[in-house]
Amino acid sequence: YFPKRARSRLHVECSDRWDPDAQQLPVRKVAQPGIDADVAHLDFDNAFEGWKGPARIRDEKCSLQLRSSLPYLVVYTPRDKDYFCVEPVSHIGNAIHMADPAAHGLATLQPGETLEASMTLDVAML
């Protein structure tokens, strides 16, 4: 979670957005050629595909770049809250119930197997 400040801005390069159903489960993929906007004007609770990283967050106090080895990104920007979330994830939520879970990032691990991921946050105070 990140504090939503007066000039919080989010920049993400991606190709698609997953829209949720009434239960907030991702069910429909639509084209979304990136995000570049003030967070106060966004209303997302979505997963994004084709994330090329880094995700950039900037406001009057700091500049942040988020990089990850994970291929999907969840962005949550509730309009009535003083925070927002930008979260790399390994798979689309609800992937286990989709026709081809692996195509949506869900990895099946055998006993003893592991899955590794990394994330880096570079922060500069302004």
Question: What is each PLM-predicted segment?
Answer:
Residues A107-M125:
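Short Pro-Gly-centered flexible turn/kink motifs
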Residues R58-G93, A99:
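Glycine-rich active-site loops that engage anionic ligands at enzyme catalytic sites
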Residues Y1-S69:
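Active-site/ligand-binding surface loops and adjacent short beta/alpha elements
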Residues E49-W51, T77-D80, E113:
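A structural signal for short secondary-structure junctions
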Residues E60, A95-A103, S118, D122:
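Active-site-proximal mixed secondary-structure blocks
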Residues V89-A102, T108-Q110, T114:
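Catalytic-pocket segment enriched in acidic/His residues
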Residues P54-R56, C85, E116-T120:
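Beta-strand secondary-structure signal
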Residues R7, S15, Y72-L73, Y83-V86, ...:
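Generic secondary-structure boundary/loop-capping signal
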